[in-house]
Swiss-Prot record:
GO molecular function, one term: ATP binding
Family the entry assigns: Belongs to the acetokinase family.
Gene3D superfamilies membership: 3.30.420.40
Keyword Repeat: no
Name of this chain's protein: Acetate kinase
E.C. number: 2.7.2.1
Gene that encodes the chain: ackA
Source organism per UniProt: Streptomyces griseus subsp. griseus (strain JCM 4626 / CBS 651.72 / NBRC 13350 / KCC S-0626 / ISP 5235)
Amino acid sequence: MEPHRVLVLNSGSSSVKYQLLDMRDRSRLASGLVERIGEETSRLAHTPSAGGGAEPRERTGRIPDHDAALKAAAEELAADGLGLDSPELAAIGHRVVHGGLRFSAPTVITDEVLEEIERLVPVAPLHNPANITGIVTARALRPDLPQVAVFDTAFHTTMPEAAARYAIDVETADAHRIRRYGFHGTSHAYVSRKTAELLGRAPEDVNVIVLHLGNGASASAVAGGRCVDTSMGLTPLEGLVMGTRSGDIDPAVTFHLKRVAGMSADEIDVLLNQRSGLVGLCGDNDMRVIRRRIDEGDERAALAFDIYIHRLKKYIGAYTAVLGRVDAVAFTAGVGENAAPVREAAVAGLEELGMAVDASLNAVRSTEPRLISPEYARVAVAVVPTDEELEIAEQTFALVGDRGPRFGQVDN
């Protein structure tokens, strides 16, 4: 039997998420999360396939590092008869947040590739080090197995220079790799393709505005399956209002905080990335809590919601102009998939752009892709659940199976 399983790893600074998929039918065989790595309160939650007969289980107690975390996950998989030593395992696919301009496609990890990911740490200091740790640990566990990097930034490498460049001194920008890279690309790729499927059309024939709204949030303009603009930039701080991030802000605010408030660069970093956005505006970053507070008459929560929606509308309008013709707007991720009031408010008043939401369709809760716009609307408005793990597995299996990466090539 040919190897047909892919293990997907998403290594964070203090956590590891994993999923094992059978690529014959794209089914999940098991998934899990190891969190609070390095703390006394470390926790591993493992969920076997619903049809496998095994029960979800949990273990607690200190897991000192990522090596121990991945070994613990491997033990749980082995307990379900899904060990990493199985000949059915084809590859391990790794989420890597930043691939710069070199990596425009999923890439088999070699020593050279790993060195290049390490060279990108200065532009992704919060994410790439953890991704590297996961790769090194997995390679040590299965040195004989293909390991594939799937980059969050890859989908956005098709942006034209006019969208990707900042209007700053070119020599300075090039010397320090300062440009707009974009993030959440794996989600944007998956959702834009699924939106085309929902419309019964080929991705090459569809222009989509994808709104990935989670605690982190980003928008993208996708023309014929290729990203032509996205809201995040050099880092995930740019763009939409997010759970704890400010999104777009006048750069002079940082100078002002340094000169007037005496804040250091690190303090400003923490302010804009961890103490801003919805949590900075009203103290909460859970949209369900914010909506409940609004219903109770909380003015701060109402203002935070209005600012969030205002920014969303600006990007929908801007990307309508960028695309020229919009066939669909797709909401995805935690807030986009579950917060009907956000979807309704974001599209309200955009009838002149051909966009509208049907209240009854918008109220339906489902895990399937679905339209929520009325039949008369010129632009389809959709809810399309994202599946980044499946997309990583698809791209990994396509590469290892010698069917070629989904988009682009590695620019050597």
